[in-house]
């Protein structure tokens, strides 16, 4: 027979021996026939002395072969029965087992939940630390989204050389239409030659003459030369003609000054003006004669010119163009100094 006993509170073999003294070991001799289950003899002793008996001088094999006499009952006839047996005891260290299976499962679940929550907290702290380390090495988001690709950067390199600090990323907004007014005393051809030399690698984009004329005429009169700029690289020059003279003595001085400006202007902007607009009807020989100082020859030629204009297919466009220029001349002119100051900001 084998008996196993677990002591939960014991730490060493000495504590186990002390605990064995509190337990009792008992052998009983019971009668099976009638009267049944009557006790005939018994043997009892504490478990420590039963398992670990004191040594005896007579016994040759200590613990291997043992003999004990049982105590008989009062009514039992005869001698006391004797028991021969051998015992072997071993004290082993073991892990404390759970009494209830459900309690063990609950403890395991609690341990797993605690370990998972601790792991999630560690991962969250690591994630919070990583973006801070990355942000110190990387650029802000706004600049990353605005950084151009290598092809765009290569295309914008000539503008960076020409304009210097005025280079902007393609994501930024460009300034609106810019109108610059130039004084008639300042030669306009010099600035135009410099810009043409810088922008010779790029072809200027052409726009319609009528649209550019309406935008320019709404800001200033046609007495000054007007320059409309779509972009820093796209510039188209519009040339204005002097208004029809009212007096022969007053119209000679401005006509000479405007002719001088026009001669310089045509030399520098031949490439853009010839491609961007059709020939002006004011350059027609008949209209030039009408705007010249009055004389007897002109008075004689006026009826013939009127007849030719009425019979030609261009009569209506010329009349509309002359009425439009007259309405523009009647508008008040703005001072040129303010526009010059605004123009210097973009150049």
Curated annotation (Swiss-Prot):
GO molecular function: myosin light chain binding
Biased composition (Basic residues): 153-166
Region called Disordered, residue ranges: 115-199, 234-285
Spans through the membrane: none
GO biological process, any: spermatogenesis
One Pfam family of this chain: SPATA6
Modified positions (Phosphoserine) in chain numbering: 218, 221
Comp. bias intervals (Polar residues): 116-125, 254-277
Entry GO terms, CC: sperm head-tail coupling apparatus
Keyword annotations: Phosphoprotein
Claim: Plastid is one of the keywords in the record: no
Source organism, top-level taxon: Eukaryota
Classification via PANTHER family: SPERMATOGENESIS ASSOCIATED 6-LIKE PROTEIN (PTHR16435:SF5), SPERMATOGENESIS-ASSOCIATED PROTEIN 6 SPATA6 (PTHR16435)
Protein name: Spermatogenesis associated 6-like protein
